[in-house]
């Protein structure tokens, strides 16, 4: 009788731990938006949408800013032109689905829409001078 009771108690504890862990994982997915990484990424999207180049560069890593300025110059475009191009190319309805942080680096996973097609994005972020910044990002229509 004691053995059966212990087995039921142990099973109950394991089930409780499993439910707690799975609830925590679900909560983590919902809380991606509350993270500093998501906030800086959303700020970069807002800057693109409004065409605010100064605000955009504040959200980006120093390396990403150098690359953007180099590409814009090579194309003979102004920063404003570059912002318009980014706005046209950016997916809409972006939903952040996952975040993995490893020290001063992080990767956001996202989905969005482009021409009515679901796109899957990976956004690399880095911590610079105590602030999270957006680095390179890539979007594809194939789920990885």
Regions inferred by a protein language model and the residue ranges of each:
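Short, well-ordered alpha-helical segments enriched in acidic and aromatic residues
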Residues: 51-67
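Short, low-complexity N-terminal intrinsically disordered segments enriched in polar/charged residues
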Residues: 12, 21-50
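Surface-exposed, charged secondary-structure patches
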Residues: 27-33, 39, 74-120, 139-144
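Hydrophobic/aromatic beta-strand elements that line small-molecule binding cavities or substrate pockets
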Residues: 121-126
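Bacterial N-terminal signal peptides that target proteins for export
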Residues: 1-12
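Short, charge-rich amphipathic alpha-helical segments embedded
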Residues: 68-72
